[in-house]
């Protein structure tokens, strides 16, 4: 399995001839859109920063789209989606939006992508069904209740990530802030790593097999877009 970061909350996961993408970036996003073919596309939040299904419909690949809670299976990949809340990128008059947390099982590993999560606790259903996480993608954009980007603050992100006991933690959403600007917001990654207090490693891509997870216990890996 090879995991690469394409900005914001977008991660491409390839294994064999199959490509899965979390939160592909659309053309009308403030972020650079993605452009590659995917077999499976998971959309956590209906927003241009995360719903670019057309951009991953490319060549001979037309993705099977998952855009909400439920149980799914496609080409040997098992996906569970759990309802949660986001306050990211709300339209005028909105107070909250639907966010979907995804648990994906493939190659004997479990990947969990929290999406644009604002809830500091997972639902009972998610807690009961998500277990033994190998790779956790956690949003770290909001800096505080007063200067929130609509997702978890670095402190809340760290607390939730630790409670889920993943083998590897991959922070996300920080590059979205760095690219779109905002006072202090581009420092979200620095703030998160300071909050976490343990060492981290920056990599351009994550090549992973089940055996590689031995010895990992909450290791933080920063995938650079």
Residue ranges, per PLM feature:
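Non-globular, low-confidence helical/coil segments that flank catalytic cores
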Residues: 38-40, 50-88, 159-162, 168, ...
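Hydrophobic, well-ordered secondary-structure segments
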Residues: 130-133, 137, 154-158, 166, ...
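Binuclear metal-ion centers of metallo-dependent hydrolases, dominated by the metallo-beta-lactamase
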Residues: 4, 8, 96, 158, ...
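Core dinuclear metal-dependent hydrolase active-site scaffold
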Residues: 1-40, 47-49, 62-131, 135, ...
């Amino acid at each position: 399995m090879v995991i690469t970061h394409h900005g914001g909350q977008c991660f491409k996961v390839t294994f064999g001839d199959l490509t899965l993408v979390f939160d592909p970036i659309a053309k009308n996003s403030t972020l650079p859109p993605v452009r590659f073919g995917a077999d499976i596309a998971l959309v956590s939040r209906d927003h241009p920063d995360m719903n670019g299904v057309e951009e991953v419909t490319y060549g001979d690949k037309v993705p099977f789209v998952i855009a909400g809670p439920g149980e799914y299976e496609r080409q040997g990949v098992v996906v569970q989606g759990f309802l949660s809340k986001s306050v990211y990128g709300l339209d005028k008059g909105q107070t909250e939006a639907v966010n979907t947390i995804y648990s994906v099982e493939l190659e004997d590993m479990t990947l969990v992508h929290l999406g644009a999560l604002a809830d500091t606790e997972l639902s009972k259903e998610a807690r009961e069904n998500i277990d033994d996480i190998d790779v956790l993608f956690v949003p770290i954009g909001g800096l505080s209740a007063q200067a929130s980007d609509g997702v978890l603050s670095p402190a809340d992100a760290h607390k939730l990530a630790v409670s889920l006991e993943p083998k590897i933690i991959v922070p996300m959403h920080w590059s979205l802030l760095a690219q779109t600007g905002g006072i202090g917001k581009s420092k979200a990654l620095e703030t998160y790593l300071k909050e976490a207090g343990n060492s981290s490693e920056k990599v351009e891509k994550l090549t992973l097999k089940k055996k590689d997870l031995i010895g990992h216990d909450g290791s933080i890996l920063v995938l650079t877009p």
